[in-house]
Amino acid sequence: MPKINTRTRIMITTSLLTFLFLLVQQYDFRTIWPINLSFDPIKPFILSFVAYILCYWVLHFKVTGERYVTILLFPAISVFALSLLSEILIVGILSDFGQLGLVLLSAIVFWVFVYITYLTVNVLNVSYLREIPLGQAGRASQFILTMIIAYISFFLVFSNDIFLVFRELFILFETFLLVYITLWTIKISKRQRIIASLNIGVLISLLTFILSLWPINSTYIALVLILVFYVCLGIALEIREFISQFIWVEYVSLLVLIFVILFLLAEWGINGHLL
């Protein structure tokens, strides 16, 4: 039997997941397990589970120990967030666009995003085993994908009527996982990764609680959270090295932007926005 190379495996896996994505759109699993939600949350769980298993195959089963979390879980989280966003868009937000057209458009975006995710995971896995020139590019790609996943998750959490406690727990858990997976790519101890991930997770969840009470649109809440997350994760990744003055200026500028967003775009009673 001819050996299938990694690039071909990624193509096959991405296509299979996209086909499954299109297939599950034909079913409503809420009829099996009654859930009082406007969208079907079972589909993203199915897709993310399959993504986790297929990632193991893509990497030729060369995954052991901690990488079952740091490597295999990353595409699963990516697929979950993207498929959940697509599910919500398809069933409601953009229904005027035409459901068939939106499904096909979502499938194309899904394929591209998943393909890039698996390529990134493969580079990170190989760079863990040995030093390769693409290692830095893989880490940069993962950072960008993490920001996209986090923003999608923050937006979905605040744009849906979710009980505050569940919202806080979800934000804490996902932020912890995303930070831990990202910090795994640099050479720090497991204890340092856990502490940094927990600190950032608690900070983001506390900010989530505050913003839940702030009179601002869910889109801007997600933007504020992702800016804070970007600063925190950036500092955590650079903590081993000297952080240049230029980077500190960037982070301070983002913090100023956050305060501007919070005060100028908030809806203050009958007067509305300050702008």
Regions found by a protein language model. Give the residues of each.
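Interfacial loop-to-transmembrane junctions
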Residues: 237-257
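Hydrophobic alpha-helical membrane segments
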Residues: 75-83, 200-204, 221-236
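Cytoplasmic-side transmembrane-helix entry/capping segments in multi-pass membrane proteins
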Residues: 65-78, 133-142, 191-200, 224, ...
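N-terminal membrane topogenic signal
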Residues: 1-16, 247-249
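C-terminal ends of transmembrane helices
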Residues: 53-67, 116-129, 177-189, 233-243
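Juxtamembrane boundary at the C-terminal end of a transmembrane helix
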Residues: 263-275
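Structural signature of hydrophobic alpha-helical transmembrane segments
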Residues: 35-51, 99-113, 160-173, 217-228
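Hydrophobic alpha-helical segments and helix pairs
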Residues: 81-145
